[in-house]
A protein has these predicted regions:
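Extracellular loop and loop/strand-boundary signature of outer-membrane beta-barrel proteins
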Residues: 18-19, 41-45, 96-105, 145-153, ...
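Transmembrane beta-barrel outer-membrane domains
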Residues: 24-28, 46-52, 103-111, 151-159, ...
């Protein structure tokens, strides 16, 4: 009698499918439109594109299991300072250190990224949530092919990216996702920043490296359309 009663008890271990917190993810692809804020790190000369709102689109595909492939395009509504190394180092009526500043200009910054994302709950959600970690690479560009008056050019440069996110998948064809990301890229200063002006002032002395690596975090929220082939 005891042996017969043990079998149904063993069958009850775990969750009944209707009450389980796990749900299989049926769709394998998503198209997300997102917006948020890009927090640019100030470079030593403060001439790189600055912080601003960011928006863009993300395509993500899950070929199998927890692994995802993704590609995204985004735009930052940024500004950038333009310096003239030939201007005098001392002046009146402007903040200290800004005597060589010509002006601050609207300067949009664009990212084209590709990478991998790993869903920590596998090919399913946990209480409708899917946490992710991601890693990738791409380019950052301002689409300017010529240097400014001070010979500085941001141009197009290689950028690493990584971060984490969480997806809320309530069921159906839509989801909401939030992501915390970081872009790492370098800016390079021209030789003119180290050449004395007529008054012997310089933007940089030789102790400042010509290359500065910048970490630039961003936080975004997006709405996704989910689908499969």
């Amino acid at each position: 009698m005891t042996a017969l009663s043990a079998a149904p008890l063993r069958a009850q271990v775990g969750y009944d499918p209707p009450s389980s917190p796990y749900r299989d993810l049926r769709q394998t692809q998503e198209l997300t439109f997102f917006s948020g804020y890009f927090r640019a790190k100030a470079d030593p000369a403060r001439v790189a594109p600055q912080s601003g709102p960011i928006f863009g689109a993300l395509y993500q595909w899950r070929p199998s299991g927890p692994m995802h492939l993704n590609v995204s395009v985004s735009r930052v509504s940024s500004e950038r300072r333009v310096l003239d190394p030939d201007l005098p180092g001392t002046c009146s009526g402007v903040p200290a250190g800004d005597c060589k500043l010509i002006d601050t200009f609207q300067w949009p910054l664009y990212f084209i990224d590709g990478g991998l994302a790993l869903a920590l709950t596998g090919a399913r959600s946990f209480y409708h949530l899917v946490p992710e970690v991601k890693l990738g690479a791409g380019v950052a560009t301002d689409f300017h092919s010529q240097a400014d008056v001070g010979q500085f050019q941001f141009g197009t440069r290689f950028a690493f990216n990584w971060g984490a996110g969480i997806r809320w998948v309530p069921g159906g064809a839509f989801q909401v996702r939030a992501d915390l990301s970081n872009h790492l890229y370098a800016v390079k200063y021209p030789g003119t920043y180290y050449v004395p002006a007529p008054d012997k002032s310089v933007i940089f002395t030789n102790t400042q490296s010509q290359t500065a690596w910048l970490n630039n975090p961003s936080i975004t929220i997006g709405i996704s359309y989910l689908f499969s082939r």
